[in-house]
Amino acid sequence: SGISHDLRTPLTRIKLQLAFIKDEQISKKLSDDVQEMEKMLNEYLQFASAGSAEKSEKFNLSDLIKNIIKKYENHNIVSEINESIVMHGRKNLITRCINNLIENSIKYAKKVHIQLNKTNNNNIIIIDDDGPGIDEKEYDNVFKPFYKIDKSRGGAKSSVGLGLSIASDIVRSHGGNIILEKSPHEGLRVKVFFPF
């Protein structure tokens, strides 16, 4: 699309200019930054196109989450998934949202706990981890696109990403809410509410 081309052109120009930088260390660092920007751009364009094309459907949220967790079998994930919780929404986007949240947790933690429960008017997904957590003052900021945390959870593995921003957009586009809290496992707790 035109937007995709407009966004990629400056990155292509930067990549061409990188070839002229003599200092290998600087060139490598800038090249890594450009690759990360390309990855984020692709991620966002995928999200934008999937969101506009996909129709809402009724699906089993319990089964969806169990299938997502299977992909992460090499990680220490403990789950308590209430059986047969059904929701109405855009299934691929919900999958994307949950993937982004799990990936954010496993990036920083040794152990991740995932729960799915139902209240009178919400399906609630809770993702806890035992990582370094996030300062309470940063809770709102981490949902902003490209926001980078200075320390703790923003250590060496930190990335200026769109994962949490996209997850938040998906939740809100379904009339839901996403909040962060301190986890009882010492790290971060992410609570996602999807209304019926």
Q: What is the role of each PLM region?
A:
Residues 163, 167:
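Short alpha-helical Gxxx[C/S/T] motif in the catalytic ATP-binding
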Residues 129:
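Acidic ATP/Mg2+-coordinating residue in the GHKL
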Residues 111-121:
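Short beta-strand/loop element within the Bergerat-fold HATPase_c
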Residues 175-176:
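Conserved glycine-rich
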Residues 78-89:
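Conserved catalytic submotifs in the C-terminal HATPase_c
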